[in-house]
Each structure stands twice: as C-alpha cells, then as structure tokens.
A protein has these predicted regions:
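Sec-dependent bacterial lipoprotein signal peptides
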Residues: 1-17
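Ubiquitin-like/PB1-type beta-grasp interaction modules and other compact soluble beta-rich domains
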Residues: 18-226
Length: 226
C-alpha cells in the first residue's frame, strides 16, 4: 500500500509539472528605461511593453537586453556588457526604480504591470548609495502610486501662497489626486529656510550621502534680474 501511494503521488507531480502554470493573465503595458550615470545616457527606451502576472522588474529587463545575473539569479550584474565594477575607490552597479521609487526588495521579486514605469540605471554609487526616488519619472509616483499602494498627495504649504497655488495646479493638471486625509505622500512648498527647517530639509542639507539628493542651495545673486 505504501508503494502504490508513493507512485500515485509521483505521477500526479509529473502531470502538474507537465501542465505548468503559464505566464498568467495580461496586466497591461509597462515602460522600460535603461540608462547610465543618473539618466545622462539612454541605452534602452521602450514606452510600451506587454506585461502579465509573472512579469517582474528583472524579467522585463531580461526580455529586452542581454542580461547577466549573480547571487543565484537575484542580482543584476551586467546589462548589454556593462557590468558592476570597482575602479580605484569608485563603485559602479545597476539600480532600479519602479514609478520613481527605488525599490527596497530584489528585482526578481518585484511584480510590475498596468502602466508601471521601470527604470534601470548604471551609476557610481560611491557618494550616495541610497537614492530613494528619481525625479525623472515625474509625475510618478504621485500619479501612479507604488507597489500596489494608491497614495494620494498632500501639499504642506510652509510659505508662499502663490507658489503653493502653482504647485497645486501643476499636480492636478498632471493627474495627481490631492487629499488631506489617509496615507499620503507629502509635498512641502516654501521658502528655502522653511524647507530646510523640516526633517527632510535637514537631511538634504547634509549632502547626498545622507539624503540621496544631489542639490546645493545658494543665495540668489542680488544684482541679477528676477
């Protein structure tokens, strides 16, 4: 009886393996952008690629480039011959974002579909390993949400009513849903001193190593025209 039971179980396993689960249903088109040096050079630009329930950030890249991986297929090592490397004291690798947010889990486990924007960038991360978001994906993530979370956007007007009104109009015109309650992304608008007084502003003032933001604030030239 034991032998028969094992045989039936094994046969069932072979049948299931033979059938396979397939790629799943279509989930809409995604865009794929592959660049280097923080987007300064475009290598691949595909605005509409078909995706399905098995599509991931890595699989979309693999289907549209010559991809090499490491660490058991979990890490992108090389794209079209451009490989992660160390040169002197500088380190270079591939990073990806979805809808403007740099993902916190591996690309092989990150599902994509339904108008998601997938962006891979090869860059020197020596001075700033943690870059939380990329402005080049705008209006994402404000208009798209992220990782199946449909966030709204709340505007925090620190100062400058005209500037706040302009930002509000711009966001709404770009399809962003503004709301004041629930889980939201916050856009702070104000004079530089007011912005730098916030926790986020204090991180920005510490440089890209602390904030991931490459920006330097300087006093305006008094003699320059407005």
């Amino acid at each position: 009886a034991r032998t028969v039971g094992l045989t039936v179980f094994a046969a069932a396993g072979l049948i299931l393996a033979g059938c396979g689960l397939g790629p799943g249903e279509d989930t809409g088109d995604v865009s794929l952008l592959v660049t280097r040096d923080y987007g300064s050079k475009v290598l691949v630009d595909e605005p509409a690629l078909p995706a399905n329930e098995s599509s991931t950030a890595m699989r979309i890249l693999d289907q549209n480039s010559d991809l090499e991986t490491s660490y058991g297929g979990e890490y992108v090592q090389s794209v079209d011959g451009i490989s992660g490397d160390t040169s002197g004291s500088r380190s270079f690798d591939w990073f990806f974002s979805v809808n403007g947010i740099v993902a916190e889990r591996g690309s092989a486990q990150f599902p994509v579909g339904g108008k998601d924007k997938v962006w891979w960038d090869y860059r020197d991360w020596t001075d700033a390993m943690e870059v939380g978001a990329v402005v080049g994906a705008y209006p994402a993530p404000f208009s798209t949400g992220y990782d199946d979370r449909d966030w709204g956007v709340q505007i925090d007007c620190l100062s400058g009513e005209d500037a706040c009104r302009m930002v509000t109009n711009q966001l709404e015109g770009d399809g962003v849903r503004l709301k004041d309650t629930g889980e939201n992304m916050i856009v702070r608008v104000g004079l530089i001193d007011d912005v730098l007084d916030t926790p986020e502003g204090q991180r920005i003032n510490k440089g890209p190593g602390a904030s991931g933001v490459f920006v330097r604030f300087a006093a305006p030239d008094v003699g320059a025209p407005e």
